């Protein structure tokens, strides 16, 4: 049964990453789950348990992406990006930093996928419009994609991984934020410094802003644009009070997304049917299916082995617990995708004998490792694979070798600094 559970997991994961002939990840994960149920690797009671773990996370994610797609249609992100470039006053380094700051803000509120897949094409079009050559374009593109994941830590909704882990360990919105805001700031500063050091020779000292369009020209519907600020303010308030009124974040985000879609239907700038169709609905099926397959590993005792490793690491204190868990999560995410990794690690943490602050440190370190680790390899997250595909369609080909060489050099120091930020947070506050 152990070998069967491992084979089902590896085959499912391979087809999810490979996606032969455009095979949908939801269908692949569903097939893997059905095989696991038929063979007895998982039971029907596991189906209910897994659904209970992932429903809030996946529906929140879909709602947040829906909101971001509407904002993209009305030119909200393009307007923001043009403002950032204008604020740099023709200084290449300032523009590089400002684009990353924008990416961090977008990632925090609209999830890492929203930041990477929506902002990167806008940045690409903008730097091309400014007349930058391929050597100069590359750093801005990598920075846009990299910052989307490394700064997707501060809020539960900033990354699907965050929501899954917070739900699994019953962590509230404000409690989560209080633990992760400082690590996120550490990650942002480290990301900017490391990316600048890596690309400093390619970033132009100055650039001509004459070809830069007026920010107002990016806005496709001024009325909906103004309304969007109110929608976002209500959304943020909803997130903050959700913990106190005991309402799942998905309900808050879902209601706001529904209202926004209704408002957008009246706009000529927004193709609501296309937006709804473009939302990642397959993530719901994928999450349930993939996590059922992961539960198969738990049922045959694979996660217990990892739990024992974590118990041994926790014996060396908080610093070792955080660093060990963070780097284990990052490594596993880079080779087998962060979605199954975060749950495998969460189960293992629960099965370990770590308690109190040691367990808390591991819980958040797992999130950090699962958020940042995927930047090491192209297969680390589904968003990265899609991001590379979008860039290829737009004429920017980044080979897996180039990505890995860049990713591993940039990610490791940022991961260490971010985990250090978590350690300092837990011992000081």
UniProtKB/Swiss-Prot annotation:
Cited Pfam families: ArsB (PF02040)
Keywords, alphabetical: Arsenical resistance, Cell membrane, Membrane, Plasmid, Transmembrane, Transmembrane helix, Transport
GO cellular component: plasma membrane
Disulphide linkage map: none
Transmembrane segments: 3-23, 25-45, 50-70, 98-118, 136-156, 179-199, 222-242, 244-264, 275-295, 316-336, 372-392, 408-428
Domain of life: Bacteria
Molecular function terms from GO: arsenite transmembrane transporter activity
Membrane topology value: Multi-pass membrane protein
Calcium recorded as keyword: no
GO biological process entries: response to arsenic-containing substance
InterPro entries: Arsenical_pump_ArsB
Location relative to the cell: Cell membrane
Keyword Hydrolase appears in the UniProt entry: no
Family, as annotated: Belongs to the ArsB family.
Function: Involved in arsenical resistance. Thought to form the channel of an arsenite pump.
This protein's name: Arsenical pump membrane protein
Native organism: Staphylococcus aureus
